[in-house]
UniProtKB/Swiss-Prot annotation:
Localisation per UniProt entry: Plastid, Chloroplast
Function: Binds to 23S rRNA.
Originating organism: Lotus japonicus (Lotus corniculatus var. japonicus)
Gene3D superfamilies in UniProt: 3.30.70.330
PROSITE patterns linked: RIBOSOMAL_L23
Stated name of the protein: Large ribosomal subunit protein uL23cz/uL23cy
Similarity field: Belongs to the universal ribosomal protein uL23 family.
Pfam families tied to this protein: Ribosomal_L23 (PF00276)
Subunit structure: Part of the 50S ribosomal subunit.
Coiled coil: none
Length: 93
């Protein structure tokens, strides 16, 4: 499934990690139930709630045609207490 693009690490998302909330960018065509099912299946966790919002589109001009570059939205996934998503990469020594 190509629903989740990548995890987001901003000041806000790092602060939300303490509340057991994980932030990631997902494709705009994916639904909440698809993302919830995929996260529960792939990571083996229970999702408590999901919030999503679209980021403001950035314009890009190619000659005379104006287009947009943002084709995703941001999901904040709250897990039930006792569950956590392991880090995707281990630190190399």
């Amino acid at each position: 499934m190509n629903g989740i693009k990548y995890a987001v690490f901003t000041d806000k998302s790092i602060r939300l990690l303490g509340k057991n909330q994980y932030t990631s960018n997902v494709e705009s065509g994916s639904t909440r139930t698809e993302i919830k099912h995929w996260v529960e299946l792939f990571f083996g966790v229970k999702v408590k709630a999901m919030n999503s919002h679209r980021l403001p589109a950035k314009g890009r001009k190619v000659r005379l045609i104006m287009g947009h570059t943002m084709h995703y939205r941001r999901m904040i996934i709250t897990l039930q207490p006792g569950y956590s998503i392991p880090p995707l990469r281990k630190k190399r020594t």
